[in-house]
Curated annotation (Swiss-Prot):
Gene Ontology cellular-component terms listed: cytoplasm
Phylogenetic placement of the source organism: Bacteria, Pseudomonadati, Pseudomonadota, Gammaproteobacteria, Aeromonadales
NCBIfam families xrefs: DUF167 family protein (TIGR00251), PRK05090.1 (NF003466)
PANTHER family in the cross-refs: UPF0235 PROTEIN C15ORF40
Listed InterPro entries: DUF167 (IPR003746), YggU-like_sf (IPR036591)
Matching SMART domains: DUF167
Protein name: UPF0235 protein AHA_3661
Length: 99
């Protein structure tokens, strides 16, 4: 399983989330997942909404174009981003390495 896949105009990412981090950042590859650190705590969906907002900003899309496909209640998530206008360097490098 690749951490980042392209399916048509969607980008599918398998993420490992680190909540309550000191800052928001895409850390890099962690096993077969992309590790993302976010400052929000994992309480009452705060981490999920913060993750969606952060990813929307990084990929320059509306929040409605980012959805959690799987793993809403855990640290391991599958996220789909519809028609990203920008791809951060960390993610772009993973896509380039796939072939």
């Amino acid at each position: 399983m690749a951490a980042v896949l392209r399916e048509g105009d969607e980008l599918i990412m398998h993420l490992m989330i680190q909540p309550k981090a000191s800052r928001d950042q895409i850390v890099g590859l962690h096993g077969e997942e992309l590790k993302v650190a976010i400052t929000a705590p994992p309480v009452d969906g705060q981490a999920n909404s913060h993750l969606i907002k952060y990813l929307a900003k990084q990929f320059k899309v509306a929040k409605g174009q980012v959805r959690i496909v799987r793993g809403e209640l855990g640290r391991h998530k599958t996220v789909a981003i519809e028609a990203p206008r920008q791809i951060p360097a960390e993610v772009s490098a993973l896509l380039d390495n796939q072939g």
